[in-house]
């Protein structure tokens, strides 16, 4: 809040001829230009983004930026911290010849913890191809939880994993606990515990997941044609409407529907293949399948083209 008020207090640069025009910033030239008349209103504009050139000993290091990372509004100081580069004099090395100052930062411990969590969140999101908006929402959730100190005693990695799970749910692209678990070092049970604690601490909620939330992705990963995906979606929806699967998770119902639809088509998939995609055991699929199998004739869409008749489907 303090940094925002300081920015608001600064005089606003405007074009004298067009005061309402939004100025265009040319960072290469360092100018601020009026788009209406082309007048250069301000010069020597400072670019607060990263400068991706290497200046430290003319060698490319892990982080080759000259002025550090771009501003991060989630950190207390916007991450405008000081970076101490490697020295060249004798005083820069200890008695064993090791550098004393290897990219040290004057950053608070809380900001350092959040930065580490943000990096872990980005890494996890990249592994399961999640877009940037999911990462941003996850970072915001983590910051709220961290500043409230409501989950003391829980590992930051576990909190970050749970925040990622919540962000996916809130953005309408849910992932399973096992999918999040697979890209983190945290157990499914611990992520689940943190998930419940975070919802309570932030007084927020997530929409209930449905079979449709996973159907498209599961079928795509199984390389199933559109007809099978549509049939599986129809089967799962009808099974829920007819109350055939009380107490079963939407994920297991979706997988059972995919198994039934694929077995009735020419593109058959085994229980193991389907289970591997969603991280669910074969027995879980079988339990849900057995519940919907007796009503199989009522579950398929009327225009479905059977390769295997309903009465020939596996009974398990």
Swiss-Prot record:
Residue segments, region Necessary for TATA box-bound TBP complex formation: 244-316
Q: Where is this region: Core promoter DNA-binding?
A: 189-193, 249-252, 283-286
- Primary enzyme class: transferase
In terms of InterPro entries, this protein maps to: Cyclin-like_dom, Cyclin-like_sf, TFIIB, TFIIB_CS, TFIIB_cyclin, Znf_TFIIB
Keywords in alphabetical order: Acetylation, Acyltransferase, Chromosome, DNA-binding, Metal-binding, Nucleus, Phosphoprotein, Repeat, Transcription, Transcription regulation, Transferase, Zinc, Zinc-finger
Its main subcellular localisation, reduced to a broad class, is nucleus
- Processing and modification events after translation: Acetylated. Autoacetylated; autoacetylation at Lys-238 stimulates transcription activation.
Note whether Phosphoprotein occurs among the keywords.
yes
Q: Which domain of life is it from?
A: Eukaryota
Q: Which residues form the sequence repeats? A: 124-200, 218-294
**Subunit structure, briefly?**
Found in a ternary complex with TATA box-bound TBP. Part of a TFIID-containing RNA polymerase II pre-initiation complex (PIC) that is composed of TBP and at least GTF2A1, GTF2A2, GTF2E1, GTF2E2, GTF2F1, GTF2H2, GTF2H3, GTF2H4, GTF2H5, GTF2B, TCEA1, ERCC2, ERCC3, TAF1, TAF2, TAF3, TAF4, TAF5, TAF6, TAF7, TAF8, TAF9, TAF10, TAF11, TAF12 and TAF13. Associates with TFIID-TFIIA (DA complex) to form TFIID-TFIIA-TFIIB (DAB complex), which is then recognized by RNA polymerase II (Pol II). Found in a RNA polymerase II initiation complex.
Give a short account of what the protein does: General transcription factor that plays a role in transcription initiation by RNA polymerase II (Pol II). Involved in the pre-initiation complex (PIC) formation and Pol II recruitment at promoter DNA. Together with the TATA box-bound TBP forms the core initiation complex and provides a bridge between TBP and the Pol II-TFIIF complex. Released from the PIC early following the onset of transcription during the initiation and elongation transition and reassociates with TBP during the next transcription cycle. Associates with chromatin to core promoter-specific regions.
Name of the molecule in the record: Transcription initiation factor IIB
Gene giving rise to this polypeptide: GTF2B
